[in-house]
Each structure stands twice: as structure tokens, then as C-alpha cells.
Amino acid sequence: MRAPPSPRKSKSGHFFYLYFRLCQLFSGRKLKRRWHVHKLHIHQYNTRWNLSPLSEIHIEDMINEPSGLCPGSSKKKPLLIARFPKGCQESPRVYVLQRNNLSRLKLSKRKYALRFYHNEIFGNNLKRKDGSIHKVEHQQCAETVRKIKKVTANHADVKIIFHDKNTIRSDKLGGRSNKMQTRPSVLEEDVEEEVSSVYIRFCDDHSLRVKDYHSLHRHSKKSSKEKRNNQEIGKSKLLGKLFEEETSRQNKGVEKKLDTIVIQKFQNYPIVSFSRVI
């Protein structure tokens, strides 16, 4: 039985390809894209920006607009991505999507790559003169985004990855020891109430209380004395088992093998020493 023949290739695809190439040639799309990337690299080393503070919060600074609402000219500009991995109190990480130079030399099949964008101009006003960071506010992230857009919006399609999305923010976790040191007269009941009021927040809409989940709350209930006692009991049980195994081997007359642990207990001192037989 003969195999079916391969479908015929339409010649109309060649005309569409030539038409697309001619449009790119006369419109200068590649030259414009390279010009935008060049201007972005010039801006990243220019630190003389007089950016006025925000008078009000804009909604486009807190969310990413859908692609249908974005202007058509933004699609012709290089993509600039800014993200806040450490929160709004730290400088953002900014990247520019541009053509990979190795792909032109046929050394790599990766046509585009994300290049790090110098971001000191976006994080200068986040710290005070004494080195301390300003108090985190809701509009602080919007101010940084507005600053990025003012500098780069004319030559890039700016997209923001906010730190609140898919990130767990925790408050007061692990701070019980600090509270006990600063306030030694605090009762244990008050401390347990403070621990029970701990919340883990997922974004701004969802949160859970540590007290409602036994697996999260059981470690905070144990005091320091109980933890030390449990550790001492666990060590004594382990040493007792090893000592019993060694004595049983000696009573049975089993020959000692290489790399075995010998336990010697001193009469006058409550010390158990470990030694290796070579």
C-alpha cells in the first residue's frame, strides 16, 4: 500500500513573507528598536534626573494594564521588566529584553536575552542619611514604579512584577525570645496570647492564624526549659542504647571489628567518652 503524498506547499506564503519584509524595510522597525535600546542604555548612566514626588496614587502604577488597553506603539518598543523581590523598601531589579549578540554570530540559538539594567537612579531616595530605611508604606511601591515609567516609558514597554503576588509575608514569627529579653517581667500567659495572635498573610486578602493550626503552634508553646529537658533525655537514651549494645557484645564473646565505637564509663566522673578502635 502506497503512502499518501505530502501536501503541496502554497506559493502564497512567499508573497506574504516578502510583503512583511518590505514593510519592515520601509518603516525602519529594526532601526527604531535598536534606537530605543540605545537610549535606554544612555539613561541608565544618567543620574541627573529631577523627578518630582507623587501628588496622588495612580491606578496604573499598582497594576499591569491588559495588553488590549496598551497603546500599539508600546508593542514596537523593547520590553523592560521591573520586579521587587525584597519588597518596596529595597531597590527594584530591572531587566531589558534585547537581541542576543551570540545569535548573530551563530554561536547560540537563543535569539533574545534579559540584560540587567543599572537601577541606582530608582533606589536613591529609599534610604535616609543615617542609613536607616524609611517606613514601608502602601504608596512607596507606586512611587518607585512612577519613577521607572517617567525615565523609561518613552523608549520601553514597562511591565512590573509586584512583590505581593504569590509571596508569603510573616509578622512576629520567631520574635518571642526577643520579647522575653526586653520584658523579663512578662507572664507566660501573656506571651502565649501574643503568640496565638500571630497571623501569616497571603497578599492582602487572605490570612491565617497560627493558633488554629497545631503543626504551626505546637513549637511556640514549648518553653526553653522543656526543650532543654527533651534534648538531655534524648541524648541519655541514645547513650544508654549504645552502652547496652556494647556490653551485650562483650558478654557474648563477639570479636571486635574495625571501626567500632567503644564506650568507656568512668567511675568518679559522670562522663561518657567515645573512641575508635583502629
Curated annotation (Swiss-Prot):
GO annotations of cellular component type: prospore membrane; spore wall
Cited function: May be involved in a late step of spore wall assembly.
Localization of this protein: Spore wall
GO BP of this protein: ascospore formation; ascospore wall assembly
Gene transcribed to yield this protein: OSW1
Name recorded for this polypeptide: Outer spore wall protein 1
Keyword terms: Sporulation
